[in-house]
Amino acid sequence: MQKRKITKAQTVAIVAVFAALNVITDSFGGLPSSGIWSSWNFLMEPLTGIILGPLLGFAATVMGVMIGHYIYFRDAYEFLFTMGAPIGAAVSALLFRGKWKPVLGYYTILFAAYFLTPVAWQLPFWGMWDTYIAFAILLVVIFLIKKGLWKHESTRLPIVLAVIAFVGLEADVLFRIFVFIPCQTYRLFYGLNVEDLQYIWGSGAIITPIKVALSSIATVTIGHPLLETLRKAGLLIHH
């Protein structure tokens, strides 16, 4: 049977819905406020990319977090850091579609930038343990893609969604770390010293992975039935 082609109007409507959901989740403060994210938008980030694709997912997330940041204003600098959210959505979208090369390049470049920054040598290595696990998982996913084993059948879809949410959110984390450490905004924006950073690295190593786990659960719980419904209705965006 020939697949039904989604119309432009339907695409615009779906993008608008996800942009609105990103606005809503970004307009409320998260608990606790420490860690990478200060709102609940991390729950929507991977799912937006998975459903909409890398470009539309990026666009919907940008619109959502920018409006959300105006509604729930943190500070002017957060408008820069929150660009990690659309990047995370795009990474989730790329990996879901088996496009691993941009994701591998992104992780490699941002890790290199961090570890080549002198102040990073004074921070606890274990403080970014979740990003290391994400990178290791990414390498496993790449192996599976190359072997033709990266399948999205209904029985495997929950695992695929959980993995993609994890890798996508950690890509967001890496962007914010890149802005904070290699770009020196910890000093230029906030006037922090090494002792301050060491405390932040210690607390973030606990809180951030908990939020990533919550998002992975939400992505599987919502994403699995939603993807099946969109596929049956012929409304799944493939690009």
Residue ranges and their predicted role:
Residues M1-H239:
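Loop-helix junctions at membrane interfaces
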